[in-house]
Swiss-Prot record:
Family, as annotated: Belongs to the expansin family. Expansin B subfamily.
One Pfam family hit: DPBB_1
Single GO BP term: plant-type cell wall loosening
The UniProt record lists the keyword Protein biosynthesis: no
Residues in the signal sequence: 1-22
Record gene name: EXPB1a
Role this protein plays: May cause loosening and extension of plant cell walls by disrupting non-covalent bonding between cellulose microfibrils and matrix glucans. No enzymatic activity has been found. May be required for rapid internodal elongation in deepwater rice during submergence.
Entry's localization field: Secreted, Cell wall; Membrane
Tissues with expression: Expressed in mature anthers but not in vegetative or other floral tissues.
Glycosylation sites: N32
The protein, known as: Expansin-B1
Disulfide bonding pattern of the chain: C64-C92, C95-C162, C100-C106
PROSITE patterns from the UniProt entry: EXPANSIN_CBD (PS50843), EXPANSIN_EG45 (PS50842)
GO CC field: extracellular region; membrane
Amino acid sequence: MASSSLLLACVVVAAMVSAVSCGPPKVPPGPNITTSYGDKWLEAKATWYGAPKGAGPKDNGGACGYKDVDKAPFLGMNSCGNDPIFKDGKGCGSCFEIKCSKPEACSDKPALIHVTDMNDEPIAAYHFDLSGLAFGAMAKDGKDEELRKAGIIDTQFRRVKCKYPADTKITFHIEKASNPNYLALLVKYVAGDGDVVEVEIKEKGSEEWKALKESWGAIWRIDTPKPLKGPFSVRVTTEGGEKIIAEDAIPDGWKADSVYKSNVQAK
């Protein structure tokens, strides 16, 4: 017969194992979602955060660096993405359709969302942490509040092209810390692929395109010993390889914490 101390040890070990296994299992992330558009739907978990009918973050920002994600063209239809969706910032601005068929409040009709933030909860290979507004958009009419009460749900998603109104153009926000020797540029409202893999600038009268480095989210930066002088053009490359040139997008006398709207857009 086992001694009482051995029995006690077994009980303690069993309790420890039980405690460890009580939480949800950690699921490794899936392969990165790329620009392979098609009709195939993939499985994902969806949650929501922020105000029930809000845009997500309390400050209407997020890990991509966008501001005012409650306003056009995002209009609060936003989501955090886990690693294979957010892609360390390279997924910022990409667009997805997402839908659910269960629980009963689900409409099974897709809602269009934009990636504006990140999450790292390992609850599924693909995980969308949606704004309250976007989560509710998957519901049947009048059932959005009921759906939000479900918490975590199973969904299906697919990547789609981003489409914006004709007057929405690629826009640049020069970040607050920028100065003539350091430029930090937030790139937003890119149609088509939505996400950006390269940003370059060219000063007026020069033939040289200077590559910016990724800073964080959708923000790109360049340090230069020679002061940058406007106007300069910006060349943006999307994940699918489309190159868009915004001629003289940043004017002479540009200022930090300023927004400059180009006159170009991706396809």
